Design a protein with these regions (language model features):
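Non-transmembrane, aqueous-exposed alpha-helical and coiled segments at domain scale
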Residues: 86, 264, 272, 287-295, ...
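Short beta-strand-loop/turn "lid" adjacent to the catalytic site in phosphate-handling enzymes
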Residues: 53-114
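Glycine-rich phosphate-binding loops at beta-strand->alpha-helix junctions
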Residues: 299-319
């Protein structure tokens, strides 16, 4: 079956679309990535999404206009990846505006902006969307949803495999080995903390909006990382939580950056970016160290996807702080780094079609497995 996956992440830089073929057993499907297309958001749309995602209020009419604009951008990306309309089903994550994990006093909730009936009409094909809602209704975090799909797409290795996505947020998947005493362990996954979100916001601020990210890690490479500050930041409450846990720009956005820059004091801009880059790597390394100490899970390799894997300074920091762990881009095993999350949502749509569960209680904390997503057919 040919499926189209659409993903726009917390970086709000645009939409990734992939066309993929799936067949066979849902847990270990035969799959082929046929095309990948990235469609950037217009600058004004990206700016508005980032601001709202950090808590700036907007009237209902403006949010309605924004939902329509986001939906139209999804359709543009879909046509770029599938110009001949070969896909028979579309999986679309939508644009996350706000994510509220569950707490002891309040259920979780998450808002992915999308007008799914409009998208189905624009593309003249059924759309599966709202993937987080069912897991949240079962008491789960609603995210991350990628780990179970990672395990199906990549499969086990000779030891524990880690898959790290460095988008706006750093989220981690751990796939148990194919043999040995830990082969029956569940797939694990959680949001570690900020990946590119704080780095990107700092670059935009320091360049007066001219640079939206640290291309090739050039700014970080020119600065010095303050490890004393990083060690202090690592003691913050979110980084002390055990999984399941999830987060987003509502926690690691402009206000958080403002606080961290204030704590850094009057340092050079390059030093600030170097410290934020080192912080991203340190957050991941701390989680892996705890996993090793608490559960005797030792990774054989760490595959890195998302835009952050194109930042050589960040990759070097990961390699250094993870103390010799083999760190490499997911491209090296045939999983295109920038296409991975869109491929996941193509798979989740196929799973919905097959009635196969897409969440994993060991990852999200939901009370049980369930099929994810809501299907909308063209009128």
């Amino acid at each position: 079956m040919l499926c189209l996956g659409l993903m726009s992440g917390t970086s709000a830089d645009g939409v990734d679309a992939v066309l993929a073929r799936f067949q066979g057993a849902p847990d270990r499907p035969e799959w082929q990535l046929l095309s990948h297309h990235h469609s950037p958001y217009p600058a004004a749309l990206r700016d508005e999404l980032v601001r709202i995602g950090q808590g700036e209020p907007r009237p209902a009419a403006a949010l309605l206009d924004l939902a329509e604009a986001v939906t139209e951008q999804q359709a543009i990306a879909a046509r770029g990846a599938d110009p001949d309309q070969r896909a028979s089903l579309i999986g679309c994550h939508g644009q996350t505006l706000w994510h509220r994990p569950p707490s002891s006093t309040r259920r979780g909730a998450s808002w992915q902006l999308l007008q799914a009936p409009l998208l189905a009409q624009l593309l003249v094909r059924p759309v599966v969307h709202d993937f987080r809602a069912a897991d949240l209704a079962l008491g789960g975090q609603g995210a991350p949803l990628v780990p179970r799909a990672d395990a199906a797409l990549i499969g086990p290795g000779d030891g524990w495999r880690g898959v790290l996505n460095l988008g706006g947020i750093a989220n981690l998947t751990l796939i148990p080995p194919r043999w040995g005493p830990q082969k029956q362990e569940p797939v694990l996954g959680w949001d570690c903390g900020p990946a590119n979100s704080l780095i990107d916001l700092a670059m935009e601020q320091f360049s007066d909006g001219q640079q939206l990210f640290d291309r090739d890690g050039a700014m970080a490479a020119a600065g010095r990382c303050d490890n004393d500050v990083i060690q202090r930041w690592l003691q913050e409450p979110y980084f002390q939580l055990s999984p399941p846990k999830s987060t987003g720009r509502e926690c690691f956005g402009q206000e958080d950056l403002r606080r961290r820059l204030h704590e850094l004091g009057s340092v050079e801009r390059a030093d600030a970016v170097a410290t934020l880059t080192g912080f991203t790597a340190a957050v991941v390394a701390q989680d892996l160290d705890r996993l090793s100490a608490d559960r005797s899970i030792h990774l054989l390799e760490l595959l890195v996807a998302g835009g952050g894997c194109r930042n050589p300074v960040l990759m070097s920091e990961l390699q250094r702080r993870c103390r010799g762990l083999a760190v490499r881009a997911s491209d090296q095993i045939g999983l295109a780094a920038e296409a991975r999350e869109a491929l996941v949502f193509a798979l989740l749509a196929w799973w919905h079609h097959r009635g196969h569960p897409g969440n994993a209680p060991a990852i999200t904390g939901a009370t049980r497995e369930t099929c994810l997503g809501v299907r909308v057919d063209p009128a």
